[in-house]
Amino acid sequence: MYKRQLFLFCGAFADFLAPYGMNDTDMLRVLEAPSLAHWMGTDHIGRDVFSRILYGAQLSVIIGFLAAGLATVISIVLGVLTGYFGGKADMLIQRFVDAWMTFPDLVLLIVVVSIVGPGVNQIVVILGCLYGIAGSRIIRGSTIAVRENMYTHAAQSMGANTLHILWFHVLPNVMPVVTVSYTHLTLPTKNEV
């Protein structure tokens, strides 16, 4: 447990903790053993290994939290809309979610990266979609429960439009589930580790 917290701390403060820049080279110190100047030694072109590990942790933390944020947005939009409106669109989207969840995440990630190309932005979008589509199922179930409550029916009978009901009645009551899902959706951070 403390390893993960240490990793997140080092990733968040890599700019302050790293003694050298990520790509600073020193050709006079190639393949140097660990010392006081270079805690984990240097690589084949004289870069400090410890600094590069810290900056790598920073990139992993950034990718993980951005992917979790995107996954949360996708799961809220899909889950609330399909859960509130229901019907054929809900059934079609849920069958797509069922099919999506049967594929292994790593295989989907490799296939999509081979199609769109490598890059940080692509990884964030792919991980966000992977976890967001699967997470929409939880939000949908909570939305269906909220939709059937009396205050939602009372708002409808008073003439409130759909957007008002979604924004002021459904979404606030789904937010506890969203919060718990977001803490669970930091799985992209764990995958990056």
Regions found by a protein language model. Give the residues of each.
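Generic hydrophobic transmembrane alpha-helix motif, especially the helices
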Residues: 39, 43, 49, 70-74, ...
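N-terminal signal-anchor/first transmembrane alpha helix
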Residues: 3-23, 96, 174-175
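Conserved small/polar residues in nucleotide/adenosyl-binding loops
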Residues: 1-5, 183-189
